[in-house]
Structures are given as C-alpha cells and as structure tokens.
C-alpha cells in the first residue's frame, strides 16, 4: 500500500520506510549506481539503487525505462551536501530502494518526451492525439492542479461564507436558441422530438429562485455550437450563480469578495477593492471594446466634431453618415513605427483591414510640436483643427496619431484590434499585471441590420433600468460584466421577474406572443406565482484558469479539449454512427460529401 506521494517527501521523513507508486521520469546510470527520478501527480523524488546494498533492486533498476509504471519500497535518506537540489521540493532527500516492482512497461516508442527534465516544444495536434501522455507533463499537471484549487476555493467561499447551495440542473432540456446554435439530441422515446444541450442553466436557475432557493450555484457544463476561437470550446464549464433579494451593488460586492478569495487562495495575490468600473459607453468610447485591456494606455480619442466639416471626404463623409472619426495616439510612435507598416501591405494596415476598416490615415507630431501631414489630410486640415487635435490627444513630440473613420462599429473594432496588436508588439503590456474591472450600463438591445430586428445584447431575461422602461429600444440594462486583462471572465445581470415586463422585452426583440409562449411559456407562468427579485452571474471557469496559469489557449486549461474544428483528436469524435442507431432515433442524414472535380 502507498505510504506517501512522491512530492510529499522532505527531510522530516529521513529514516522512514516508504512505499511509492509512479512513473519513471528519468533513469541515470552513474558508475554502477542507478538513479531514477520517480514521478506522480505531486512531483518527483530521486530513487537510488546501489548494487552493494540491494543487488536485487539494482537488477530490477537496470531494466527500467522512461514512463514505466513502478512500485518502489525503500528508506528515506538525506542527500549528501554536494547532491542537494534546491530547485526541487524533494531536493534534500533520496530513497534507497529495497525493492522495485515493474507494474507495466512502455511497449511503443513515445511520440514525444514526457520527462520534465527533457520537456520539449511539441505540436499541439500531437499533444491532443496523445493527451494522456501530455497530461503527465509538468505544465499540464500544474494547470489541472490549479483548476482544482480554483474550484475548491469557489466552493469553500460560497458554501462556508455565503450560505450558497449547489444544485444540478438538467443537461437534456428544451431548445430555446438565442445567439449561438444549440446542440440537438433526438428523442428515441418521443419520435420526431428533440432535446437540446444547455447553453447555460439560465432558465432553470431563475426557476430555482421562484422555488425559494435564494442562493444557488453550480459548476455547470454548457454547450454552444458556434465557430471557435482560441478562448472558446463547444463544451465548456462555467461557475453559475443566482441570488434573490440582492441589489446590483450587493451582487457586485459579493463577487468582488469571491474573486479576491480565489486569487488570494490560489495565487497568494491580494487584489485591491473595489474593482474599477466603466460604463459600456465609456469603454466603447475610450477603448473601442466592452472588454478593454487596461494593462496599458493607448486610449482612443473621438474627433468626429473636429473634422466634420473638413474637405477630406473620408472623414467628413463618415460623420455625415452617422459614423465616427477616432484617433489612436501612439507615444514615441514616430521612432518605432514606419510609414510602410501603416500603408497597404504593412502589418498594422492588415490588422485594421481584417477588422473591417478600409485603411488607416495617420499624422505625426514632429519634435518642434508641429503636426506633419501628408496627402489629402495635409490639404484639408486647418491650423485650428490641428491645434484641437493636439489638445484632445495631449500628443507630445514624437507621437504617431492613427485615424479610424467609418461606421462606429467598424471604427471601434479596427482601432481596438490595432491597439491590442501594438500593445503586445511594442512591449507595453506587463505580463504579470492582473487588471480587473466591471463594465456596467449596457444597452438592453442592439439592432441587427441583417435580420431587421432588435436583439438582446446579453439575453432577453436581463432587467431594464427602471428609469428607462418607457422605450426599451434605448433602455440601459441592469447588467454587469467582469473583465480581466481584456477578456470577459464573467457576465451577469438583475433579471426580469414580472411577467408584463418580460412580455414587453420579448415583443421588443421580435418574438410574437405565440412564439414566446411556445418557447418560454413555463417561465412566464412561473412569474404568476410570486417570483422574487433576483439576479446572478456566470463565470467562464476555463477562461479564468487560462488567465491564472498564463496560458494563451483555453485548451491548456481543460483536460480533454476539442480543436478549433470541434474535434477530439484522441477519441476521433465526432464520428459516424450506424444506420441502425439512426433508424432507432427516426433520424436520416441529408449530408453528402462534396464531389471532387476531375483534373
């Protein structure tokens, strides 16, 4: 029976007889004495096999190879002074092996090195194909251990300090798509009908508030059939919370204390509170994004009114058509950014155009403080306009001013993308910084020009600001998102709890009475039975862990993730199923493989 984990052993255990289980991380033969680094999920410890002390264990050690699974019994000994390893938590001790038992061998060539001593850069597709080996490596082991610590800290805070209870909600539920597509599951028992996998437990947690469970939480599995990015997965985990009888300020305060508890427990970091706040309008105006990265400056400056009447039609035309002209000032940009990079073919130009912009105009502030302009801007920018631009941007000599002009949406998206690109490229971001902030006062709805209707900016169960009830198309939502280093890690709101307001919101977003009843009739009915005021929030657990571990991809915060093509390279899911299975479900596939053209 195991007595200790490998990473637990310290000088206090010297003289103790121990039994360890683990994998051979590395084997070294030094002049007749064999050293083995034995690894389990807690760390590694050095095993010594000396032929003069235990010939039998030495013979067994000779047959060991990397990643063999072994059981080792021996005695803890202090290392000689010259062999101490301060980089290793177990570096003061070693185990003299009395007996080594091989439990399983490696019978195929390893696709990559697992050993922490020889950790190499491995292609991600290979890591995902052999994920069980990748998870043995230090990096992924640390990530999953930290993920566990985060969940443990969440449970301890919510249950022990705030009287929340954990309740599971259904995974097979009704399809009520809003935004992303649902994953659908055919019902064999009810032919022709379908379940959906939940995009969130939103409706059920609101029903739990109706039921009187006034403080609910769940570590919930959620599913969205959407195009994937580096920080998204088709199935993901979220911390889901809902509370009755709390104001928005009380919910924000509770969540700040929760986040501070997680960071203190997991990373030993004291977060200053309260967290900064921006309104949605402020965030979009200054950063072009509702999830701004505030670890660096480079704030946008709106000069639409300054250039509205100038002869340069790109600027004046954008303003006349209801758009914006904004400037992204780059201090010391004259020395660091060449014209070539801003013009067609340049990397900065590419960032802007990939976000929808036609291009970027620019001017430079020379060392004498004068604006140096080129082309059409030079011919149409008056001295008064130049002076006002300098005043608003507070541009110092050497500053590069990048202009975005067009629809408000494209200007914000393109300058936000350029800002993020330059923040990294110019080394303006402190990689150790952790900048948290709340974004509040979101619009209730936004106009979808393609579908010619309003859509809920968050979801249609978000409560409008009581001051804005007269016109829901211009109303502010009682919503709040929490942002960490430019990524939204959580979003929530106070909820609608009165049937008449909920029906008005459905009508505003184009749901007929019949559609609303068919999709959400059960919720509307519940509102007739004494629903308390309530609100909540949901955190993307995978994304939070990604940020806490310093990883670039959410896949490195998940044990068995999918690729950006929504595939599992380990199990080869999704995969074909038999005609018999489809027949049992009364389902037929209409998909046809594309016809290859002949040469």
UniProtKB/Swiss-Prot annotation:
Entry keyword set: Aminoacyl-tRNA synthetase, ATP-binding, Cytoplasm, Ligase, Nucleotide-binding, Protein biosynthesis
Major site of localization recorded for this protein: cytoplasm
EC number(s) on file: 6.1.1.23
One of the protein's GO biological processes: aspartyl-tRNA aminoacylation
Gene: aspS
Organism: Synechococcus sp. (strain ATCC 27144 / PCC 6301 / SAUG 1402/1)
Annotated binding of ATP, by residue: 224-226, 233, 488, 540-543
Superkingdom per UniProt: Bacteria
Renumbered residue ranges of the record's region Aspartate: 202-205
Transmembrane regions listed in the UniProt entry: none
CDD domains assigned to the protein according to its UniProt record, in alphabetical order: AspRS_core, EcAspRS_like_N
An example Gene Ontology CC term for this record: cytoplasm
HAMAP family associated with the record: Asp_tRNA_synth_type1
Pfam families: GAD, tRNA-synt_2, tRNA_anti-codon
Name the record gives this protein: Aspartate--tRNA(Asp/Asn) ligase
Reaction(s) catalysed by this chain's protein: tRNA(Asx) + L-aspartate + ATP = L-aspartyl-tRNA(Asx) + AMP + diphosphate
